[in-house]
Every structure is written in structure tokens, then in C-alpha cells.
Amino acid sequence: MLFRSVIHVASRVVSKQALSLLCEHSDVMATRQTGWAIMSSHCVQEAHDLALVAHLSAITTSIPFLHFFDGWRISHEVNSINRIPCEEVAKIYPYEAANDFRKRALNPNHPYQRGIAQSQDIYMQNCVVAQPFYDAAPDKVQAAMDKVASITGRQYHLFDYTGAKDADRVIVVMGAGTTVEETVNYLNKQGEKVGVVKVHLFRPFSRKHFDAAIPKTCKSICVLDRCREDGAPGEPLYLDVVATMNQLKRNATIVGGQIGLGGKDFTPAMVKACFDNLNKPEPKNRFVIGVNDDVCHTSLPYGAPLPTLPEDVKQCIFWGYGSDGTVGSTHDAVKLIVKNTDFNAQAYSVYDAHKSGGLTVSHVRVGKEPIRSEYLVQQADYVACHNSTYARKFHMVNQLKEGGIFVLNSPWNTIEELEKNLPNHLKRDLANKKAQFYNIDATAVAQSVGLKQRINMIMQNVFFTLCPIIPGGRAPKLLEADVSARFGSKGKEVVEMNLNALKQSLANLHKIDVPASWATLGDDAPRVWPEGTPEFLKTLYPALYSEGDTLPVSKFVVGGVQPAGTSKYEKRGIATVIPVWDAEKCTQCNQCATLCTHVCIRPFLLDAEEVKKAPATFKSVPAVGDELKGLNFRIQVSAMDCSSCEVCAVNCPTNALTMTNFREVGERESKNWEYAMTLTNKGKIGRASCRERV
């Protein structure tokens, strides 16, 4: 296929047993036979630079280019890069070749045919005739890389090698090269002799350039693919390397492994495990890493996180929830840092499958050197929890360094309240890590100034105060200017609310002295499952608490099969305010239940016996409608499923629902919901006999 074209692809999973929107290379690998050249970038800076290389190469080679980079991991990352000015691009642009390409466009003044039908006697010849273009392509792509280097100072090769000149073990990889590169530099300082080849041009695969990249001292090679081809003897890059080394008649032990399927994190500790595998007399081949394969035993074990980053790099984790502004504020914080300091910065956020109110975990790194660490923060200097309900659900302090800062957004400002409400595992970890512990009721501050759940500016101010990355006390003024710039289009009132939130934030920040007694606390009480909970959920519940990485392969069912109706056991408890029903105002229109997207506020009918058994707080009124005589009516919310969206209260025609602070009524309404779930089904109710629900 000869046609000058370029597409830039954020590579994603071609879903198998379940849907996934995260990173993998299976979609790119499905295009291998199309005749398109395939180019890989390993970080944000490379994605910027090689995008230009791809366009230049397409023009000079007459081959279409697919330029890809890791979806989500790189495509959704915010990082500081050096942009190429347009005037510099103009200096190396091949105008003559581009004009020649334009002349080949379909035009009635000089027509020709494309996409014709060919019979068996001539089709094959027409396939082979294009081979010279593919043979010449690698050198032309390298020439394009050299041209880009002439205006940027950043030199790329088809296969970029980093490591010891006399390396005996080498990893070959696409997409995760900078993480491997970071680990290689660390291991070589420890006395190892290892290296990495970052593949940039996967198609056409150049034997000559690959041979030049592999050190002559190399005895063993580990090829890492970010995809899995069931039934194949190996994955695509591995098979290419095996064939190439065989054709070059170079002797080396070659093994393949699979990394990062479905967006699974790939860390320096895993890189070290791959190198350690090559040291064995018989290295494991076609292994997986990042999971515990206790079924086929193909996985490699790996150790604790490695300190591969420079000491000056500050790493932070922000546990937020969808719609609270945490993700946006971390991105803005990174931009403020880069614009107003000499630091480089990186931000990347992880999301769950929920929309508003879902879990978000934002990872931020700040350092003097460019940051190319394409994995989640593992050793944090600063951890912030923006939702108090997370304290009991997640192990947020696991990644905190000893002596690091932990900030909690909660209504518990005294040690007595924290003692009562925090789980033992969190208190024990804070004490053992000698953490600097701060608490702020950011939600109350936001509500007091009219921002409802938007705590982003409050927590951003706390971050810059406790981590003075921006020197000279300039952060407050910069934040105020940022508020005006970001929210100016929404009106003066919104700007004033955010400025007031900034002013009040630090006055509500409290330093907590962690009691020494917390260090010896026992474990929390074991989880008690409701009667009837399926075994499937009991087995896989760690996935609900961001601990799915701990689950071995044997816990899963082939084909991704699972029981229906398991969401009722999740009970996220993320609401800050929930609707409380006023029976006297309610007209029983049921609009609230119709509009609730989470189906967590519902109408209930009670017979006389159920009314008698109801808790004192479970008030009800006679139901409207002839067919409902003798029954009582109640609107009840599931406090633990509510997301505080307020749609029900806003749309109630008689204002019968009042959004009330969760901590005031949450426990009461949860018990009311439990009773509501025991009520009997009253059967099908005729539309003419009661107020319509739809």
C-alpha cells in the first residue's frame, strides 16, 4: 500500500473476555499486515517529536505511517516537554516531495484509477513490486530522525540503545521503554551490566539497524510485548526479534514476556525481575509479570519498589472522587509549577468505571530533570485523601514514605474524633511511618462559601502550603490569579466563591499529633457479609477497594463470567449530603425515583403490619389511589448509594426533599433503607389507581 498518510493512535485493548478502555498494543498489532509503517513512542516528549518524524517519513517514503503511544498512560498524561516551534519545522519540511504528493491526487484533469480488481495471474506481481519502497524506508526514517535532531538536539534512532556498552543482558521493548531505561541506569550503578533497546520503527523491521543496536557482548535478550496472542508460539515483537537474530546468525538466549495487559502497571521492580530471569540457567519463556499466575505458573515474582528516581523528585498522590475537581486541580498545579519554577512535572490520573462520584487517584511528580517514569507513584512524599469515606475503604498510606505528609479531608478535627472514626490499619500505618498528619474539613469550607462539593482550590492551597515547591511565598498570589483565569467566564460570583475558599482554607487546617499508641493497634474487625452474598463477591471483593492487583489468576472464571446484580453489595458511601423526605409536603408523584440515575431513592408501600414493625424513624403516610386503600407510602433513599447529585431535590415540585449533611442522618437513613428492603412486593399497580411513576 503506497499512499502518504499518517494517523496517531493512543493504543488500547482489543477487548476479549471483558471491555477495557486502557492501554495495550493489541489494536496496533492487528494492523501488521496492512502495509502501514508502525512507529512507537515511549513517553510524552517522544510522542511530540516522533509525530513530526512520522509525517516527514510518510512524505519521503511514500508509505503510510501509524504512529502510536500508550493509550491512557501517555495520551492522558500531563508532562512538561520542549515543543518544536513551527518556524523550525519549516526549515526541514520537504516541500518538493509534498508538492509531488499533491500532484498524485485524483483529479479530472489528469485522471487515473485506484482500487481496481486484479485476477490471479497478475495480483501477486503487483504485491511484490512495492518491496523496494519498504526496503528503502528504514534509512529514510533515520534521515527524518536526524533532521528533527538538527532542530531539537534530541537524537532518535530506529532502535535506541541505553545501558552498559558491554551489557550481557538486554531488554527489547515498545511503549514502556523509558521505565526500563530508568531501571537500567539504576541497576548499572549497582554494578550490573544490562541494557535496553527501545523500538521506534516496528514496521518495516530493519535487521541492519537492530543488529547495530544490540551490543556484541549480549548473551541473553528479553523481549517484552504489551499484548497477548493466545495460541501463538510468541507475541509479535518477540517473534520478530527471534527471526531477526536467526537471520543475523547471532547466538543469544531469547525469551519473551507479556507486560501491562489492560493497563496493568509496569514498574522498575518488574523490570529487575525480567533481568533476574535472564540470569537463570534456563530462563522462563513466554512469562507474564504483574500478576500471580497460580494456574499455569507462567508469572515472574518481583520485589519491593526500587528507588530509581533522583532524590530531589517529589512524588504525591491525591485520592479524590469524580466531580470534586481533584483531577483538574492536579493538572493545574503541574502547569503552575512548570510555568513559575525551573522544575519539570508530571501528572497522571487513574479512574474507576463510575462517573460522578467515582474514585480518582492522581499521581504527581516534580523534579529538576525531565520525568519519564511511566508508572504510578510508589513512594510518595505527600498523600492527600479528599473524601473521608475512603479512610475505611482504601489503604492510602501504603505508598507514603517514612516521615511523609498525609492530609485528610474530614469533619474530625480532634484526636478523639479521629480515634473513633479512623480504622486501625490507617492509624497504625501513620504511627509506624512517623507521618506528618493534617486534617481539614474542606467540604464544610466549600459548602460555607457556596461551592458545594468542589473542594479542589481548597486542597490545592493546602498542597502548596505543605509542599512549598513554588518558592518565595508566591503560591497564594498565583492561585488567586489562576482562579480569576479559570473561572472568569463563569461570572464574578463563582470567582468570589473560589477566592473565599482559598482565604478560609488554611484557617481550617489542623496539625494532628499522632499518638505513639497507634503504632501497636491490632487489626480491624473482619468483614461481615450479609446473608445471601454470592461466593464470587466474597472472593473478588478486593477489586472494589482498589486492591485487585493482589488477586491471583485462580480466583477468576474463564470468559469473564460473573453473577448478575452484584452492584447492590458495593455501597460506596460517597455522599456528603443526602435527600431527607418530608411526608407532609410530598404529593406522591414519584418524580424523584424516576429521575434518580443511581436508582437509590425509591417509593415504598407498606401494609398495616409493616407499618407497626417499622422503626420509629420510618414514617409513612396513607397512599394516594383507590387501589391502594389500606396501604401506606414512603420515599426512602439508600444513603450508601447516593452520590449527592441533588437531581431529586432540585426537581421535586413541592420541595419535599431536603439535602441534609450525611454525617447527621446517614446512619439513620441506612437503617431505614435496610427495613425498606424487607417490605413485601405489593404486586402490579394499575396506572389509573395511583400516581404514575413514568
What are these regions (language model features)?
Residues 16-22, 49-53, 76-83, 87, ...:
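Short acidic, glycine/serine/threonine-rich loops at helix termini
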Residues 19-71, 95-96, 243, 247-260, ...:
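Conserved thiamine diphosphate
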Residues 31, 142-290, 363-365, 380-382, ...:
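Thiamine diphosphate
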Residues 40-100, 263-303, 497-519:
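Structural signature of the thiamine diphosphate
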Residues 65-160:
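Conformationally flexible catalytic loops at phosphate/diphosphate-handling active centers
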Residues 146-169, 299-313, 568-569, 620-625:
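Glycine-/acidic-rich phosphate or pyrophosphate-binding loops and their flanking alpha/beta elements
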Residues 204-208, 217-220, 224-235, 239, ...:
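Active-site cofactor/cluster-binding pocket
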Residues 488-642, 649-693:
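Ferredoxin-type iron-sulfur electron-transfer modules and their immediate structural context
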